């Protein structure tokens, strides 16, 4: 009886899960958002403020907020943290010069009270570019193994082709099932 109730509940439970997509400017956040929502590449320009789209996967609704990553906008990221269940950090795998800035912003976010229960998905974007940092290198630079208070996953991807994006969403879905 309990299994039947659970299955029926899942059919009609239309709870929305808030996701924020952050990262430095030109990392590919908006391209990823529109790959999720339209399954295609759209021409983007730097995001001033945010873009928001609802993504539905197997009756699970995600409200995804893509937040601008320019230096002048990063201080406002915390205004989006309330009720966030997942943080997607998009890393430009070709940008070795700013990986330390990404690490600094990541740990600022993780220290915020409103994100204490949020899961963390890191997309290592632009993996199609020769000479880019590998997932292992990015993991090491970001010191991901030191993160103990958040469930996290790093996923190689290419926003332009969509490669790797579904695996990231599958990880998020698996985290929801555990709760």
Curated annotation (Swiss-Prot):
Top-level lineage group: Eukaryota
CDD domains: Arl5_Arl8
One Gene Ontology term, aspect cellular component: trans-Golgi network
Binding site for GTP: 23-30, 66-70, 125-128, 159
SMART domains (UniProt xref): ARF (SM00177), SAR (SM00178)
InterPro entries: P-loop_NTPase, Small_GTP-bd, Small_GTPase_ARF, Small_GTPase_ARF/SAR
Entry keyword ATP-binding: no
Lipoprotein is among the record's keywords: yes
Covalently attached lipid (N-myristoyl glycine), positions: 2
Gene Ontology terms for molecular function: GTP binding; GTPase activity
Entries under SUPFAM superfamilies matching the protein: P-loop containing nucleoside triphosphate hydrolases (SSF52540)
A single BP term in Gene Ontology: vesicle-mediated transport
Keywords for the protein's UniProt record, in alphabetical order: GTP-binding, Lipoprotein, Myristate, Nucleotide-binding
Family matches, as Pfam families: Arf
Entry similarity comment: Belongs to the small GTPase superfamily. Arf family.
Role this protein plays: Lacks ADP-ribosylation enhancing activity.
Annotated protein name in UniProt: ADP-ribosylation factor-like protein 5A
Organism: Bos taurus
Higher taxonomy: Eukaryota, Metazoa, Chordata, Craniata, Vertebrata
